[in-house]
Amino acid sequence: MQHRDEILTPSQLNTLARDLLESAFPLVWIEGELGNVSRPSSGHLYVTLKDAQAQVRCAMFKPKSQWLTFQPREGLRVLARGRLTLYEARGDYQIVLDHLEEAGEGALRRAFEQLRIRLEAEGLFDPARKQPLPVHPRRIAVITSPSGAVIRDIFSVLMRRFPLVEIELLPSLVQGDTAAAQITHLLRCADSSGRYDAILIARGGGSLEDLWAFNNEQLARTIAAAHTPVISAIGHETDFTLADFAADIRAPTPSVAAELLVPDQRALRQHLGQLQQRLLHLQQHRLDQAIQRADQLGLRLQARNPEMHLRLLAQRQAEAGRRLEQCLHHVLDRAQGQLRNHHTRLYALNPRQQIAGLQQHLKHLNPQQPLQRRLQQEQLRLHGLVRALEAVNPLATVARGYALVHRADNNTLVRDSAQVCVGDVLDTKLAHGQLRVRVEVSST
């Protein structure tokens, strides 16, 4: 009997086989026809991939199968990617898929992705190279098919939004083997002419094969090198081509591209109206400022006018004269009042007035009073007043043998011999008469 080193169970054998398959085939691509398509309520997808000689079971679980962009069906040729494994419970050999696409588009998508990565690495799609669209384009070139809904939609939107724009259709094939070369030639001619403010490349929706002309490398390079802003509108919103990546702006549809190219005339009219109002307001403000400035300059000029200055000086002079006259009148009135007060006081001190008053008082004395005593008192008072008057009367001094001497030239009273010199003429007042004498001798 042969020696048995190790005896395996079915599960152990299947586990070893699974590990061997998964390590030997980590990821495989396989192309074939779909068969035995099953999609139960769990959402998982179960199919077989087959060719004329063989078939292999495949499974795609719900997290992946729910994102499929097509409906798997019997006989459909597909390209699948997955991991080779073994279902241990039944010992079934199968592939767990993570990607599934229709075989015809699969090769195209791989070629597209490889070219996109290469051009992107060159910086062909760098946002820094993108040009902005003109704000108010005057002439636009449209490269598209001359027939179909695309050009009609573009014309309709452009005319509705901005009728002033000039549109030039550059008719071209948008599908087929020669389409890419024709579009590239028209784009190069339009850009080099310098006649256009923007260039629109447009096409309606279609399959990947229908849109393949816009994945041409030479077309993408021509778009990226154009000096004129280029906007692309190719296929539907979910479709992306190399022309979209190279263009300055990518629009989801041709109609949206037309809206992006030109401003809305209604918004422009509204904006122009606002600008007009702002301009009118600014003009009125400037005019008001100019008028105010002119008024200020006029007032300053008027203030510096010599005639105005002289008139102002005359007014000030008249005012000063009036105030001086008032001041003089006030001083004169005050002096006259003081003079009247002094006159009244001097009149009250006059002995004659006092004597007259006393005499008048004597007339009204009561006869019943002791007349003799009263008369004596009044006589004594009268004698006192007379003596006081005589004491201050300079003529009384002269009457006693003295004389009043004045200088003849200035009538100055001479009190000291030092006030005169030999030869001076003096006027001498005597008790009776006056003498004019000349000084012969002067001694102190």
Curated annotation (Swiss-Prot):
It holds the Pfam family Exonuc_VII_L. GO terms for molecular function: exodeoxyribonuclease VII activity; nucleic acid binding. Its main location: cytoplasm. One of its GO terms (biological process) is DNA catabolic process. It comes from the Bacteria. Keywords: Cytoplasm, Exonuclease, Hydrolase, Nuclease. Its EC number is 3.1.11.6. It is an enzyme of class 3 (hydrolase). NCBIfam families: xseA (TIGR00237). Heterooligomer composed of large and small subunits. This is Exodeoxyribonuclease 7 large subunit.
